Amino acid sequence: MSQHYRTLLSIGIPIMIGQMGMIVLSFADTMMVGHHSTTELGAASFVNNIINLAIITGTGFSYGLTPVVGALFGRGEQAEAGQALRCSLLTNTLAAVAMMTVLLVLYFNLGNLGQPVELLGYMRPYYMVLFASLPFVMLFNAFKQFTDSITLTRTSMWILLSGNLLNILGNYIFIYGKMGAPEMGVVGAGVSTLLSRIIMVVIFIVVFMRSRRFAAYREGFFKLGWSRPLLRRLNSLGTPIALEMGMETASFSLSIIMVGWLGTIALASHQVMTTISQFTFMVYYGLGAAVALRTSYFHGQRDVQNVRHTVTAGLHLMVMLEVVLGGTIFLLRNHIGAWFTDSTEVSSTVLTLLLPFFIYQFGDGMQINYANALRGIADVKPLMLIAFIAFFVISLPVGYLCGFVLGYGLMGVWMAFPFGLTSAGVMMWWRFRRYK
């Protein structure tokens, strides 16, 4: 098992660092917007939850490339892996168009979702700027899943970190109106995000086209052309993963509508804790991605024993991460709210959300580990049903029950998350047990 621990960490740590870079960026966005205006923080909270639903759903779709390239890499078929990247760029672009159509419909109905009227003027322009960045997110995801699947995880790590540094600099310039730029507030945060996402895609294209380590993959990318069976396989693998991750995120994003009924302070507090929650989620997902990569590698070699050992090692490491991250956040609990806003009311409300946050950490890590194990072995169709039961049949009704029927307010809405995530983890573990 020790070899599996080392391998998972060597692959997973660069992914975790890249993911943490994304969350540091989210921290920076939230802190810089929050200190500019609590009202803008509330608007950003609502818009980010909707746009992040599309981004995470799209990211899930791009994960369909992982078992394909991972298995090809395990068999040494580099040209075919390059062809798979080409096909993934097409399917990801088409997925972006589909999601943007839905987002456009939502944009024209923002005023009908029961949100505070004073926030709509901030929501609409910020929404459209982030809307424009979605195609670049999907193109980046295709390149990232490809390089991660051939174990070059440091490539995406460095590109992500570079893009995030540019984004933070852009936030400073556009939110506060520095270096001759107009003071744009929350819209400036969106402009900075859009520019950084475009730049990251350009960097990835240059690296893929110029680096010698991708030479064999470039040959397949340009010479093997389009493959209809491969396009269908990417769709058949990516769609269930997209729906599973989308339903999980939707349980959070739809909760934001209920939170909006509680007012601006509740929305701002929810955004602060969502940012903290995203940090732990992304770290767990970095390790989960390593589990998916290693299971797809061994699955391509028909090595059942090492698939199982990899998944068990992943669960052990996941529990260690939960203890370390949960303990750190507990020690810093009295300072978290002040990092993001000057409002003492928001800071005190944030403290009430820490209990459900700590409770659901194990369930979150468990479902991430086994979801990625199932993706690695390409057993993805059951994920849709599991996600529907866990997040729509269990989580959302429990959130409404605790938050409004029983009268626990924002904390009640958050109490639903432990129920949904833990039930998802148990069902995914049960499904993986059948692997032979």
Predicted regions and their residues:
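Short alpha-helical transmembrane segments in multi-pass integral membrane proteins
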Residues: 1-15, 69-133, 181-239, 295-360, ...
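N-terminal transmembrane alpha-helices
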Residues: 3-31, 35-36, 52-64, 68, ...
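Transmembrane helical elements of multi-pass membrane transporters/channels
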Residues: 10-29, 129, 140, 163, ...
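Residue-level hotspots within pore-lining transmembrane alpha-helices
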Residues: 17, 21, 25, 54-58, ...
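Helix-terminus/linker motif at the lipid-water interface of multi-pass membrane proteins
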Residues: 20, 24-42, 110-117, 173-184, ...
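Small-residue hotspots at the loop-to-helix junctions and early N-terminal turns
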Residues: 38-49, 123, 127, 190, ...
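Small-residue-rich hydrophobic transmembrane alpha-helices
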Residues: 41-104, 140-151, 155-156, 256, ...
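Short runs within selected transmembrane alpha-helices of multi-pass transporters and secretion channels
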Residues: 62, 130-148, 156-164, 189-205, ...
